[in-house]
């Protein structure tokens, strides 16, 4: 499971996920990519599930680039615990996704196979996505 090796602080404020993704919004490493069209959170488990779906479909054909990393800790209190008494324990890690963010890229496979793999991966994600290709200038 993906998570930071160390962080400056153990717990963070909830915050608000607003705006569009300007960084990480272009296809940089591969030839075809999957891009978020809605905002949301992607847990480390979802990142891994989508990666496995892609790698199972393309087998040993190409290279997968993961462009997201879960760097935000999410805390939860145990069941049947009263309110108050401080913030809960860190349960899992998420990556805040803004519309326009590139999530995964593939290099070295034909476009039809990559589209099939991304369709399988999109089913594992909690927001809408689209498939984009690299534009050559």
Swiss-Prot record:
Looking at the UniProt record for this protein, which Gene Ontology cellular component terms does it annotate, in alphabetical order?
A: cytosolic large ribosomal subunit
InterPro entries attached here? Ribosomal_uL16, Ribosomal_uL16_bact-type, Ribosomal_uL16_CS, Ribosomal_uL16_dom, Ribosomal_uL16_sf
Keyword field contains Ribosomal protein: yes
Keywords linked to the UniProt accession: Ribonucleoprotein, Ribosomal protein, RNA-binding, rRNA-binding, tRNA-binding
Please name the GO terms that the record assigns under molecular function. Answer: rRNA binding; structural constituent of ribosome; tRNA binding
- Presence of the UniProt keyword Secreted in the record: no
PROSITE patterns registered for this protein in UniProt: RIBOSOMAL_L16_2 (PS00701)
Origin: domain of life: Bacteria
Q: What does this protein do?
A: Binds 23S rRNA and is also seen to make contacts with the A and possibly P site tRNAs.
**Protein family:** Belongs to the universal ribosomal protein uL16 family.
Protein name as catalogued = Large ribosomal subunit protein uL16
From which source organism is this entry? Answer: Acinetobacter baumannii (strain SDF)
Q: What is the lineage of its organism?
A: Bacteria, Pseudomonadati, Pseudomonadota, Gammaproteobacteria, Moraxellales
């Amino acid at each position: 499971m993906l998570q930071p090796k160390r962080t400056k602080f153990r717990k963070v404020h909830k915050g608000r996920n607003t705006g569009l993704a300007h960084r990480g919004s272009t296809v940089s490493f591969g030839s075809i990519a999957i891009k978020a069209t809605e905002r949301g959170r992607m847990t480390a488990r979802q990142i891994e599930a989508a990666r496995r779906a892609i790698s199972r479909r393309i087998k040993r054909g190409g290279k997968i680039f993961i462009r997201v990393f879960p760097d935000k800790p999410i805390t939860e209190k145990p069941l049947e615990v009263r309110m108050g008494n401080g913030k809960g324990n860190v349960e899992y890690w998420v990556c805040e996704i803004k519309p326009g963010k590139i999530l995964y890229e593939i290099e070295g496979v034909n476009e039809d196979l990559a589209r099939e793999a991304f369709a399988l991966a999109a089913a594992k994600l909690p927001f809408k996505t689209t498939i984009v290709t690299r534009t050559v200038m």
